[in-house]
Structure formats: C-alpha cells, structure tokens
C-alpha cells in the first residue's frame, strides 16, 4: 500500500512540562527556579561569612545539610578561611585567592576545586563551564560526603595560589 501524500509538513508536538506544587510532592520544599534549570542561584555577590551563611540557609534540604557540612569542614580544616558569595555559589579561600566553591542544584550540591586536576587523587567530576582544570564532587546526600577525602583536597588546594590571588 503506497504512503499517503499530504501537502502539509508534519509539525513536531511540543508539550509543556506539568507544573507541580509542593503539596503534590511528598512534603518536600519547592525548589527555586535556578536549581531546577541547573543554573547557580541568583544570590548577590558579597564577601564575608554572613552572606555565605544566608546563602546556605536559603537552600532547601538536603542541599542545605550538605552545604552546612562542607562549610563546617572547611572552617575546621583551613585556618584563616575567607568566605564569599560569587556567581550564585559560596566561594572559599585562604590567603590570596579562591580555592573551591559550593553551590546547591536540583538533586545535588556541587563542590568544585579550582585547579582540581592537580589534586591527588583527582576528584571525579569535571564540571561544564568552570574551567579546564576544575574538578569536584556532586554529593546528593550528607551520607555521600567522604569528609576525610574532602578535607585532604581542601588542604591540597589551599596550598597553591587560588583564583584571583598572587603567585606564591
């Protein structure tokens, strides 16, 4: 049987994603639009502890719990820790420059190390759009955090110049 001929080209069907409210979920908090799209939050850039703590407090669970543990681990591991919110994520540095960043996204937290390709062992995740040598991890729960390994990476990355810092 020959194929039916039509004068109109077929048009692809475009479906809008279903909108869900927090009430339809299992009692979970509604994620900010930026977390759903995979982009960093729209938190304003600001230096100091207070803006970072406010950024972390704005995250829904489990991202907030993960970010709080990473922040506490950084404070315990690195004397003279400096904090800042930049590009919608919390940034951490020691001395002259930023060493690593942490940001909440849908389903996980990104913990990315500047010059992470030089760390031993090299962290497993190569993020898109964060530089060729940036590496990190993307824990989905607090249980996914290997705190001993993360602390070791924090020490290693803090021992070399960070982004925006002077050469040592």
Can you describe what each PLM-predicted range is?
Residues 1-168:
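Charge-dense, helix-prone N-terminal extensions
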